[in-house]
Amino acid sequence: MTPPPPPPPPPPSHDAGLPAGRDDELIGERIAGYLVEAEIGRGGMAVVYRARDLRLDRIVALKLLAPELARNDTFRQRFTHESRVAAAIDHPHIVPVFEAGETDGLLYIAMRYVAGADLRVLIDRRGPLDLTAAVRIGGQVASALDAAHDHDLVHRDVKPGNILVAAGTDSDHPEHVYLTDFGLTKKSLSLTGFTTVGQFVGTLDYVAPEQISGKPVDGRCDVYSLACVVQETLTGAPPFQRDDDMALLWAHQYDPPPPPSGLRPGLPGAVDGVLAKALAKSPDDRYETCLRFVAALRAAASGISDGQHAPTRVDARAGSWSATPEPPPRPPRWARPVFPGP
């Protein structure tokens, strides 16, 4: 007896094409008022497309989250709340969020489209950056992170792929850096490194020890991740490289980071101490903010020990300082008291 023919395949859906489908499955589709034009990025939780806003006729970056996330009610509520918070942050180094919502079972975020490469591509193309450029880029990222922390948002996934590098304005500002991937519920469904749908939030090369152990996290976990990124910009590789994921997680929790000056001769030795503090296993032993970390890095690059200030510039035309300075000149007549004292 001949078996019956198999049933026809189900019609294609957004769920089938989002996490693992072909790159072009959604190209040309309209989603929530946006015309999808091209895929520009893909991760474990989302896919990012270049799309055209059909209402305002502008190009945006449209991030579509994995469909299973939309089926979690708590996740959807947090997504809505945190997307609104992210959209309210007006900062020159944070990619603006235009809109976030849900359509046809998909959660989406529409953001400014930034022309340029991310830091991952930049490092792969050019190799390690010079110390001045690393400090300059790190400072812009640190400014964005601290602004987010002021709004009670912890990024949790700071990595070169989330740092966009656009053209700057002049030779003193050769690049303008944007931090992206806010508003993706990085605060998640708990205060630990895992979402309640069982997905780890973070990238293993840059993840802080407290994220691995499932402890509560705050902005200092972003200090750790930013330090991993800075070390990679200086040496060409993140602090820890291991053959398998478990060994890498162990290294973040227990192994001391390698001094960058040993990997790249010519770096000031003071840079080692700054990065060692930013990469401390305990958050209490790190810098309190990202900007304090970069300020210490800048001082180390300038040959100033931590805790000191840069020397004050003195105008040579003002003359030299004397141990017995001359008395100040008499005030003009109009500034003298009307009724002189006895």
Task: List each model region and its residues.
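Activation segment of protein kinases
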Residues: 22, 71-74, 166-216, 243
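Activation-segment/catalytic-loop signature of the eukaryotic protein kinase fold
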Residues: 100
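Protein kinase glycine-rich loop
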Residues: 36-43, 48
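AlphaC helix of the eukaryotic protein kinase fold
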Residues: 66-88
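Protein kinase catalytic-loop region centered on the HRD/HxD motif
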Residues: 141-153
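C-terminal lobe helix-coil module of Hanks-type protein kinase domains
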Residues: 52, 155, 205-307
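Conserved short submotifs of the Hanks-type protein kinase catalytic core
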Residues: 104-118, 122
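Activation segment signature within eukaryotic-like protein kinase domains
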Residues: 137-138
